Amino acid sequence: IFPIEERDVPQGAVEGDYVTKTQPFPSKPAPLTKTYLDPEDVFGFTPWDKGYCKKAAEDYRNEGLYTPPSIEGSVHYPSAIGGANWGGPAIDASRNILIANTMNLASTIVMVPRSDCDKALKDLARDSVQSRFSALQQNEGTPYCTIRAFGFMSPLGVPCTKPPWGSLTAIDLDTGDHLWQIPLGTSKDLAPFPFWWIKGAPNIGGPTVTASGLTFIAATSDYYLRAFNTSFFVSSLISTKGNLTVGLHIPKSDAAYLTGEGLLAINIAL
């Protein structure tokens, strides 16, 4: 158990709402992803879309973790599609190591007064990019509807956050230190050539660990199942697709099998 400290967080909620002055932060482990989108550190394949991302990051409320939703629009980073997400972590109890896959993705949210909520999204959005990559949520019975982005995207549909967009991290639960952190996946099956060079792709499913010290994870948008040494980063690839958390099936025989979406049963040695 590591100490928790209260830190000041951004203030200024919309009318009718409130935020607390402080939030609890653990002293360890260190954050798995970045928590602030620096306008000087945005990403783009071209100067045009990078410039768009920079200006948008400057125009929105963008004060890091716990930036309140606002009428002018706020950056959420990590977002509902970022950080340690749907797949969840895995724990190697014999080695006291936690393995977590994460997404380094931001999103935006705009609070719209109820009087304007009958308008179309294209009329409420700041531009066509926000309209393409957002949804209008009505939030019936509240003073606001919201324009919630699926991701903070450039005009080319590329995340404004710098790669890696996906990572895998091992944490020593005794010390709270990161043992290793590596980009997870590539853009090979996500983007056209020549943009396969990006390391660290969006990912969904979580990792699975074995008692023998192996970590297996599919999860990524490229078609590989990856195997790692849990204690220190050594990897290998199996060419197959799977976006869900890999299952480990141990029948009465001595064999063990990996199973999951897109996977045949793969025999492994524990």
Give the role of each language-model region.
Residues 92, 96-98, 106, 116-119:
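Substrate-gating cap/lid region and adjacent catalytic-acid/histidine neighborhood
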Residues 77-80, 156-162, 196-198:
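Short consensus segments that form the blades of beta-propeller domains
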Residues 1-19, 63, 69-72, 109-152, ...:
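Extracytoplasmic/lumenal domain signature
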Residues 1-83, 87-92, 96, 100-101:
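Extended catalytic-interface subdomain
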